[in-house]
Amino acid sequence: MESSLYDEFGNYVGPEIESDRDSDDEVEDEDLQDKHLEENGSDGEQGPGGSNGWITTINDVEMENQIVLPEDKKYYPTAEEVYGEDVETLVMDEDEQPLEQPIIKPVRDIRFEVGVKDQATYVSTQFLIGLMSNPALVRNVALVGHLQHGKTVFMDMLVEQTHHMSTFNAKNEKHMKYTDTRVDEQERNISIKAVPMSLVLEDSRSKSYLCNIMDTPGHVNFSDEMTASLRLADGAVLIVDAAEGVMVNTERAIRHAIQDHLPIVVVINKVDRLITELKLPPRDAYYKLRHTIEVINNHISAASTTAGDLPLIDPAAGNVCFASGTAGWSFTLQSFAKMYAKLHGVAMDVDKFASRLWGDVYYHSDTRVFKRSPPVGGGERAFVQFILEPLYKIYSQVIGEHKKSVETTLAELGVTLSNSAYKLNVRPLLRLACSSVFGSASGFTDMLVKHIPSPREAAARKVDHSYTGTKDSPIYESMVECDPSGPLMVNVTKLYPKSDTSVFDVFGRVYSGRLQTGQSVRVLGEGYSPEDEEDMTIKEVTKLWIYQARYRIPVSSAPPGSWVLIEGVDASIMKTATLCNASYDEDVYIFRALQFNTLPVVKTATEPLNPSELPKMVEGLRKISKSYPLAITKVEESGEHTILGTGELYLDSIMKDLRELYSEVEVKVADPVVSFCETVVESSSMKCFAETPNKKNKITMIAEPLDRGLAEDIENGVVSIDWNRKQLGDFFRTKYDWDLLAARSIWAFGPDKQGPNILLDDTLPTEVDRNLMMAVKDSIVQGFQWGAREGPLCDEPIRNVKFKIVDARIAPEPLHRGSGQMIPTARRVAYSAFLMATPRLMEPVYYVEIQTPIDCVTAIYTVLSRRRGHVTSDVPQPGTPAYIVKAFLPVIESFGFETDLRYHTQGQAFCLSVFDHWAIVPGDPLDKAIQLRPLEPAPIQHLAREFMVKTRRRKGMSEDVSGNKFFDEAMMVELAQQTGDLHLQMI
């Protein structure tokens, strides 16, 4: 490098080179071009008469050699060139999406259901939809009963008779369980969700009826699904295992159906267990069946005392069906009589013949008449002779005899099977033979048609029971008439998740009007009333289906009396809802919330493993609350999220859904605990008073225990606060021996209209101004109900307490007696009266039913005694070698009980537990002398203190109840003077 060409800093200072000259020429050319444009006008257009020769030269010659940078090259046509000038195109940057939202969302299809696109049926979809429009040809029923009594398999039999499919796998001899649509239901071998199907069934005259049937779970933990199903049904089909008889959930289903004013028909299922398992002779099988029916009737009679007289079940009346879902057959006495008439070709009065096939009726073959007395030399009852003996013959010969004898027996019954059929295994052959002999379930359909009312016939009773509005409204009249042209009213009780679990479809029953796709409806929640319309949204119905368990039939409208699955309205629905026309101007009232026959007393706290995923878990908990009718999810003051359920299996199912379906996050679960209640066992030791903050008002109150059984009557709806004073007075005076003045001075139940606490105005008109008391009544009631909802011991509900207002000083000026003054004061005085009445904790207690062999009974006693449980009865199960042990067990002691029980009985005992009642926990929760030692079991008398302290800790409260919080200063002075009071230690 020559040093003369560069300066000391390395900059070139030599002669001009060629490349610099070129760049200078380009700059000059640009300047000339700009100058030329300015001469031709500011907008770049050629001036009049101006020459364009120079520009043409530049474009034609020099632009061909111009270097174009890669980013300036035009590889593709513009959007305007492709789509035209009339189309607006937008280019969006990926940065405009939030970070948590992927640019391309993956298709979210969670496999939690077993489904098919469509299923061929023996009748067309148009025929099924046509039947929906005729309420007289529709029957809405729910299959209810105990666990493993065959409800789902019985449903399989009906599905097989209406669809081009087989629900029985002949290779592995397992049933499809068509209505167990969830994968975990198939794995656990129990039903978890209630699932509907609409089947077209023929009666014995080949007339078709649309039977909307809801298959419900039999496990007592999932009885909330049964409650939701019975609300939509016009009748209950009670499925009972012939061998096991009436069990705990059978009893509860009977009671629940009667409380809902639903007629009951019975299917005695698994009759073949009497033949193949118990090996009972036909006569003993009859005794067993008769005993089962008698027990059912006893329960119906016992439950009918509060709901009015209901017809008892009787096979001769046609409301009992005998069946075996596993073998695929069913019959009633009437259908069996018709089979005899057809087989022998004899003209007879089928109903009279059927009425003689049950009870102590004998057939005298010599005179060919039926009599109450047995023939000379003895004989079997008609049911045994004409029904059980042929049934036993079919079973015994198919299972154990030679092919020839089976052929002969079936030929006598008018059935011929192919040679290939006889090569089948025993179970498939038995199914084929029985289904050929007994035919379709026409007897079952006859029973539904005769004993279950149609939607129109049942409408008045259903609406009276579930609708909260008055009877003199046009809506009520339309619902009673099932008027398709009336105002729309739909009761929603179930929500089913879509395949991606992001939203839900809602399932309900149309009572009046016609629900159509594209229709705008008002969605009224459980908190809606014409006075308070906050819980109301307007949504558009986007799709409607007939829900068929594993597939759906799309429809454009749903007439009154039909069950329908609805898309697009679920956003604001939590449990149940009422749908009505968005344009309807009259006052609309809602359908009542579901009244469950059990309580969610088991709770557990949850939190995400990764704290940043808390919003996902909270959203998942919201969906859990939608999916499970009885599940309660709430946030404690400490910030922990708790889930309340009916038992361990219920919570296990919830947690599985939360982790895998609704939140898809890892969730940590705390040890399960139980809900408690707070109560008193004595009257308040002194009159407790509290002054309002402005010192202008003073309320004096005492607390005392309620009469035994009264809390249960209030909760079960036997007595209602909505009754007039005369009705209330008569009820309390006759049943609980209250004086008329006290009975008519009841102000409220708490913490709600069916709460197990009572507030009475026990003031004297001569001492207290009645007008002023009435002016502040609502505020005092609100304070009482607030206090009853969260008691002073550990923020648990108060139960079984009667609060009496014995004195009050109310300011005459409305300004000084506002709700802000009265509500907190009423709550505080209720707490102080409660604390002075010897407070106690109450814990929930399970009723436990255990099936066991007799040699395991002793071990069961031992296991129960370790957990503070006690046996109430142990009796043999009639006709079986098993024993039924009935016991009570505190819920807090029940965790792990089933595992413990099976361990000590080598897996031979099986138990089911369901909430039964509340019991007082031993010990005084306010006894500070009790020292709780970590990692040591507390003595029985220390349990109340232990439960209270640990519950308060878990909720983030101080360990002890503070007297300063609930007692006024003047009250504290008065308390200090009563030095003999046992609870001074609390101050």
From Swiss-Prot:
Give the residue ranges for region: Disordered.
1-54
SUPFAM superfamilies to which the protein is assigned, alphabetical: EF-G C-terminal domain-like (SSF54980), P-loop containing nucleoside triphosphate hydrolases (SSF52540), Ribosomal protein S5 domain 2-like (SSF54211), Translation proteins (SSF50447)
Q: Which family does it belong to?
A: Belongs to the TRAFAC class translation factor GTPase superfamily. Classic translation factor GTPase family.
Span list, region G2: 189-193
Q: Which residues form the tr-type G domain?
A: 136-422
Query: Which parts of this chain are annotated as the region G5?
Result: 395-397
Query: Region G3: start and end of each range?
Result: 215-218
Q: Which domain of life is it from?
A: Eukaryota
Write out the ranges of the annotated region (G4).
269-272
Identify the residues that bind GTP.
145-152, 215-219, 269-272
Instruction: Identify this protein by name.
Output: 110 kDa U5 small nuclear ribonucleoprotein component CLO
> According to its UniProt record, in which tissues is this protein expressed?
Expressed in flower buds, open flowers and siliques. Expressed at low levels in rosettes leaves, cauline leaves and stems.
* Molecular function, one GO term: GTP binding
InterPro entries (alphabetical): EFG_III/V (IPR035647), EFG_V-like (IPR000640), EFTu-like_2 (IPR004161), EFTUD2_N (IPR031950), P-loop_NTPase (IPR027417), Ribosomal_Su5_D2-typ_SF (IPR020568), Ribsml_uS5_D2-typ_fold_subgr (IPR014721), Small_GTP-bd (IPR005225)
Question: Which source organism?
Answer: Arabidopsis thaliana
What is the purpose of this protein?
Answer: Splicing factor involved in pre-mRNA splicing and component of the spliceosome. Essential for reproduction. In female gametophyte, is necessary for the egg cell and central cell fate determination and hence reproductive success. Involved in a mechanism that prevents accessory cells from adopting gametic cell fate. Is necessary to restrict LIS expression to interfere with egg-cell specification. Probable component of U5 small nuclear ribonucleoprotein (snRNP) that is required for pre-mRNA splicing. Plays an essential role in female gametogenesis and embryo development.
What outcome is recorded for mutants in which this gene has been deleted? Answer: Gametophytic lethality due to female gametophyte defect, when homozygous.
G1, as annotated region: 145-152
Acidic residues bias: where? 17-32
Other remarks? This protein was named 'VAJRA', because the shape of flower buds when ready to open resemble VAJRA, an instrument used in esoteric Buddhism.
GO BP, one annotated term: mRNA processing
Against SMART domains, the record matches this protein to:
EFG_C (SM00838), EFG_IV (SM00889)
**Which NCBIfam families does the entry mention?**
small_GTP
